[in-house]
Amino acid sequence: MAEVANNEQQAPQFNIQRVYTKDVSFETPNSPAVFQKEWNPEVKLDLDTRSAKLADDVYEVVLSLTVTAQNAGETAFLCEVQQAGIFSIAGLTEPQLAHSLGAYCPNILFPYAREAVGSLVGRGTFPQLNLAPVNFDALFAQYVQQRQAAAAAPAAEEANA
């Protein structure tokens, strides 16, 4: 009887319902002067992910990229893209679900966000910008370790008190 109950547990399911651009911004605050200078930029990439439960087994994941290019001490451009997706995810344990929302879904969204950034930079008439792949699995593992360390720190302080 227990075997039948275990077999009736929901098998893991993952479906992409939709991938869409949630927000886009491109600024060239120092144009046209920035185009007159030799192009030797310092490019900085900041990224963030967040997720929200929309319904039972339905989640929105948003990957935010901010790319800032500094050239000759001035901001050449600032590009912000929020690439989002709606995913149906069922039959996973809490740790598996957290990994899916924090690493697997952002891995799916990143190529779309990278293309949007590249397109916006090109439309700004700047040289082509190819963002390197991001290891979201490693970033998520680092995030989990930081959370565990933060949770352990207060417990250690209480034990010493």
From Swiss-Prot:
The lineage of its organism: Bacteria, Pseudomonadati, Pseudomonadota, Gammaproteobacteria, Alteromonadales. GO terms for cellular component: cytoplasm. It is found in: Cytoplasm. Belongs to the SecB family. Keywords: Chaperone, Cytoplasm, Protein transport, Translocation, Transport. Homotetramer, a dimer of dimers. One homotetramer interacts with 1 SecA dimer. GO terms for molecular function: unfolded protein binding. GO terms for biological process: protein folding; protein tetramerization; protein transport. This is Protein-export protein SecB. InterPro entries: SecB, SecB-like_sf. It comes from Shewanella sp. (strain ANA-3). One of the proteins required for the normal export of preproteins out of the cell cytoplasm. It is a molecular chaperone that binds to a subset of precursor proteins, maintaining them in a translocation-competent state. It also specifically binds to its receptor SecA.
